[in-house]
Amino acid sequence: MSATGEETYKLLEETSKTPEGRIYKLPQDYQHIKQKYFYSRENLVMMLKSLPEEEKAVIFVSSGEDLLKMKEIFGDTAAYYCSDNNPKYGKRFNELTECVKDRELQKRYFFTTKAFGIGTEIKDRTVKHLYIDQWKPTDIIQSAGRKRPLDVDDTCTVYFRDYDADWY
């Protein structure tokens, strides 16, 4: 199952037809996302520091370099994850289990590259904010899909980086 597997499914269908009884489709539901905003990169730190104390945030950054910058600013108040396979930054940050344990964030802020999005979910009622610094539609879908609601009252706000705003 995948929220972003359309291209793969098309390729598979072109090479060999899948029997009807073996195709399963589940609806994508983003009802838990109550509000959506755009942010400029220069405002990110101010926005994060102004969040209510009891609320947590997942921040999907573009690179290991971004993780280093955020670590300079937020220090031990946040967790930082980059794939171990990243040759330049892989071993410089937290292990995934130090960031997310039993599907809950271990720190108020969790900065990560999109590597976190592969096969991982967050079921944490205190995660109320997702900041997505991605521009590819499939990456955005994967990032937004990491937060899984526990019930209808478990909602969040998603902030998409406005790349045009960074030019001003």
What are these regions (language model features)?
Residues 111, 120-133, 156-158:
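A short beta-strand element within the Helicase C-terminal
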